[in-house]
């Protein structure tokens, strides 16, 4: 499952909760570009540049920008513009302290609650991890890690944990891209 199929699956799963799927799609596409450092930390960008980069109109992008600012990936500075947040090692280390405990709880619950279809998907991901781990394809490794995390959260079925993970994971993935 590629990254954008994963996003589509997320939107399908959210159903009526995804009141504005374009906003969600804009958020995920911009998050991916920021995490992969396509927008370098510390640079200023315009709303138009962001919208053009993902091929989505400015209104959903404007809403996604607010969400990305809340997540700590962008800073909206009055009269100065939109700044891609810096990657702060100490902050990420503190995030990892929280993430570790949360990841353990999510994985345990997912192992207990996973459906047979989800268990099959876990097996497929494990096989793909094995084949990719021998390569130095960091993009594929990060993609698989993200798919694994999404599947764990889905299998766990706890929306509160899912929201917390959604805040932490992009920041830790971006740190990995910046320092790997």
PLM regions: where:
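Short linear motifs at protein or domain termini
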Residues: 1-108, 112, 160
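Conserved amphipathic alpha-helical segments that form helical-bundle/coiled-coil interaction surfaces
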Residues: 116-178
